[in-house]
């Protein structure tokens, strides 16, 4: 019975992740809180973790703490970039960064970059946050995770580290 439950749990996690993966990561150049531009091309050759957030989202706040641990664990092996979407403004982001002791770049997006990552369109404008994208050194999205019940371990537990370890070892799903 535990075996069947385990298979079902794995199947649910796989079905809830990766639907936006396997394609070239859309390029961008976005400003951070201090006005410095961050271009995705500058991170070519290393694993990049992008999370799309809103500072008022409780799951995004929880993820910020997890990403701080990811940055501490992996150092230069993994670049962590957060992208905030409207209605976040400079004051909200400054408060968020200070409140979570964030050292990695938090970038401002007017919505176009996040829409290209999430494949949002006028016909399908739904954007769920947080959403994490894992990008390999060649610029391909290898996996992505939107926050759902069956992906909570990615956002709250060690699941994200396992996915990063898999990608660093060259064993990504796509």
Where are the model-predicted features located?
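Short, internal strand/loop/helix patches
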Residues: 96-131, 135-137
């Amino acid at each position: 019975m535990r075996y069947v439950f385990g298979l079902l749990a794995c199947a649910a996690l796989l079905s809830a992740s990766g639907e936006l993966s396997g394609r070239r990561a859309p390029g961008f150049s976005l400003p951070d809180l201090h006005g410095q531009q961050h271009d995705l091309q500058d991170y070519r050759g290393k694993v990049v973790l992008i999370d799309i957030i809103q500072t008022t989202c409780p799951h995004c706040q929880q993820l910020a703490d997890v990403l701080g641990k990811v940055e501490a664990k992996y150092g230069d092996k993994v670049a962590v970039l957060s992208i905030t979407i409207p209605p976040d403004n400079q004051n909200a982001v400054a408060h968020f960064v200070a409140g979570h002791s964030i050292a990695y770049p938090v970038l401002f997006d007017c919505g176009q970059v996040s829409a290209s990552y999430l494949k949002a369109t006028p016909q399908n404008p739904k954007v769920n946050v947080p959403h994490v994208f894992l990008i390999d050194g060649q610029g391909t999205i290898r996996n992505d995770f939107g926050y759902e019940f069956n992906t909570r371990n990615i956002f709250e537990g060690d699941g994200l580290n396992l996915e990063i370890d898999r990608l660093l070892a060259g064993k990504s799903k796509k």
